[in-house]
């Protein structure tokens, strides 16, 4: 009985964490909204998108977990402290995420990513829209970076899970908060919202997922302080909802 409860708590923990963080972010949006939002017109659609995402993610994880990834580092590397391994993991994963995201904004691959850009308003749950191919490509970067955590302490994986949940919700939040100094290193809502803008100059800008350094190094950086006027979001074309969800 105890084992069953333990397994149940372990299975429910990510969902409880997701909604706990979501409620905090919703409170922040209510107190300091960047733009007025009609939550009722969006929330139920995004709840459905969340359900589809969870089902798709579970399937993708089951499949990709079977991919054999060799330990491609010298044996001496695995004696490094867990903190060092975790930092290296994030550098490799985030570098991969940047290039996968950049690939998704090319014509041949755009269809699998455009659902993510379809919300007309951005708020903490808006970033959950993702097709199955979208999830697969982003999950591959995690898998390729995973050998860096070989023999790492278990707490490192807890940190990654919590950070991944916070990150996606955080960067899409509808808040007025800004910090130019933080944006020198990390992606913020203000920074990422530019990427979701309908403006052609913004569409392939600020592609970073966690760190802003890749945008600065590879020519896709757009300074949030240079934005003139209000941003508008959504797609510049009408696409069938079915095609959006499937990614074709």
Where are each of the predicted segments found?
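Short, Lys/Arg-enriched N-terminal segments with co-localized hydrophobic residues
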Residues: 2-7
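A transmembrane-helix-recognition feature enriched in membrane-embedded lipid enzymes
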Residues: 22-23, 30, 47, 209-220, ...
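A membrane-cytosol interface segment of integral membrane proteins
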Residues: 229-248
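Specific transmembrane helices
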Residues: 12-74, 78-98
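Membrane-embedded catalytic scaffold of the fatty acid hydroxylase/desaturase
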Residues: 51-60, 80-232
């Amino acid at each position: 009985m105890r084992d069953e409860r333990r397994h149940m708590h372990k299975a429910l923990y990510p969902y409880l964490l997701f909604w706990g963080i979501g409620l905090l972010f919703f409170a922040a949006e209510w107190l300091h909204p960047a733009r007025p939002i009609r939550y009722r017109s969006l929330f139920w659609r995004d709840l459905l998108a969340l359900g589809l995402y969870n089902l798709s993610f579970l399937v993708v994880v089951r499949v990709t977990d079977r991919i054999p990834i060799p330990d491609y580092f010298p044996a001496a590397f695995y004696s490094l402290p867990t903190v060092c391994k975790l930092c290296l993991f994030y550098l490799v994963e985030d570098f991969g995420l940047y290039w996968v995201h950049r690939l998704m904004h090319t014509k041949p691959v755009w269809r699998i990513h455009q659902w993510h850009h379809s919300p007309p308003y951005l708020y903490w749950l808006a970033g959950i829209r993702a097709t199955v191919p979208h999830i697969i490509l982003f999950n591959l970067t995690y898998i390729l970076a995973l050998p860096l955590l070989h023999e790492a302490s278990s707490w490192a994986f807890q940190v990654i899970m919590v950070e991944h949940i916070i990150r996606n919700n955080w960067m899409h939040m509808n808040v007025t908060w800004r910090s130019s100094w933080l944006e020198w290193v990390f992606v913020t809502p203000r920074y990422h919202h530019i990427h979701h803008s309908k403006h052609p100059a913004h569409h392939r800008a600020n592609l970073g997922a966690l760190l802003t350094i890749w945008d600065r190094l590879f020519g896709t950086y757009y300074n949030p302080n240079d934005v003139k006027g209000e941003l508008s979001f959504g797609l510049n074309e009408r696409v069938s909802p079915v095609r959006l969800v499937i990614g074709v």
